[in-house]
């Protein structure tokens, strides 16, 4: 929706298809500014973006990278997210995230350079008239980051539970797709079967 509001020219490349991305970058080579936008972890299938390849390609074509890491924070990179997972600190232009998933609070995160943050705060119409977070929420956000930093056992337990759950589903014959994260889909093949399974789980 944000891209539509900017009225910028946009290209959509097939899911995680690096040759498709490169074709789009070639076609837009003459543009003054280019921004590649991707999820870090895809919420439907639980697979992750090849962010290392995306960043390499962005640098080759002089493009910026924005990653929405709502489902990677608290999960990948010892809980620090997909940028840390691929050791790309300092090479991603904008990181977006959420406190409402793994961190269990509310609110969102936009991280980038100081210039980028100042520009966004002063030019984004949707932010100009919005209020600040209540102090209690800000304190809870800070505490959630401290827990993530100081208590790595939570991320370790998450992965232990994830691997156990996936292995048990597979042993029962369920297809869990291509997920490599704690988002584990169960492929049912058709909606009728999915609805029946859902009813039995209630």
Predicted segments, located by residue:
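Structural motif of enzymes handling amino- and sulfur-group chemistry
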Residues: 132-151, 157, 161, 170-171
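Active-site phosphate-binding strand-loop segment of PLP-dependent enzymes
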Residues: 11, 15-67
């Amino acid at each position: 929706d944000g891209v539509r509001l900017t009225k910028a020219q946009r290209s959509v490349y097939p899911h995680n298809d690096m040759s498709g991305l490169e074709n789009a970058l070639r076609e837009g080579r003459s543009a003054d500014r280019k921004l590649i936008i991707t999820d870090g972890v895809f919420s439907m299938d639980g697979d992750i973006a090849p962010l290392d390849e995306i960043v390499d390609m962005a640098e080759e074509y002089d493009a910026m990278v924005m990653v929405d890491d709502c489902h990677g924070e608290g999960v990948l990179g010892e809980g620090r997210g997909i940028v840390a997972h691929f050791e790309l600190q300092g090479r991603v232009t904008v990181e977006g995230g959420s406190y409402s998933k793994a961190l269990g609070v509310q609110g969102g995160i936009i991280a980038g350079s100081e210039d980028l943050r100042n520009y966004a705060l002063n030019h984004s119409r949707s932010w100009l008239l919005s209020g600040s977070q209540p102090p209690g929420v800000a304190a809870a956000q800070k505490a959630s980051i401290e827990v993530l930093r100081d208590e790595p056992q939570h991320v370790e337990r998450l992965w232990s539970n994830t691997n156990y759950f996936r292995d048990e589903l597979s042993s029962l014959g369920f297809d869990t797709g291509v997920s490599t994260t704690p988002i584990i889909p169960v492929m049912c093949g058709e909606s009728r079967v999915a609805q029946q399974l859902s009813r039995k789980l209630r």
